[in-house]
Amino acid sequence: YYMQTTGNKRHALVMRAPNADLARDPRWGRTEESFGEDAFLTAQLTIASVRGLQGNHPRYWKTASLMKHFLANSNEDGRDSTSSDFDTRLFHEYYAYPFYKGITEGGSRAFMAAYNSWNGIPMSIHPCLEEITRKQWGNNGIICTDGGALKLLIEAHKSFPSFAEGAAAVVKATTGQFLDAYVPYVKEALEKGLLTEVDIDKAIRGNIFVALKLGLLDGDNSRNPYLSIGKNSTETPPFMTAEARRLAREVTAKSVVLLKNK
């Protein structure tokens, strides 16, 4: 809500955080924003992060917590196109566990699919997006691609010969948001019969659910208590209060871990 200022009157409705992927290689470029390689610890911190971002109002969220990057994307070399290969037990008990807990206990209803493949199928089109995260875990919200994923699907993974076919596969996987230019390709896929409007409706249903939780469809008489945060230019933002600053310092100090080579 720091964006609800006089110079920039809009708020961050979807926060692309936390990073619930497991950091197994320190060379990975996203290690600094992760919680480490321990699945249980990462799951617990993911739950806490999601709850903190979304708040405890019975109807509305402060912001939507969009976890990333689903999943097993912690190798640095070739992480935009390689395949992470492991069985379903490792999927459920290790790599997917923080995301599972973020949804079922934390209450997140949004995540970003990773660039890589799992067992040869790119995550942006993987059947597990619908079959596991939606049908088994109950994610009825947003699934989005990472930036450039559609292009990588064609040029790096070489899964499809055309962008229209790639876009159709992404939508059919119930992914409702692209972080790429996608409109021309989705339109082409629709015109060529690669997609139906039913497919599109199914994919974007979760976007509408999240919009409802954020009060975006309420109109002028919204009862969302969070919409007023930051509108009063004389009011101190919640994250800038003395208590918030004190807590941030305490958390930072207590999170430092010293390691000794022996």
How should each PLM-predicted stretch be described?
Residues 1-262:
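Glycoside hydrolase catalytic-domain context in secreted enzymes
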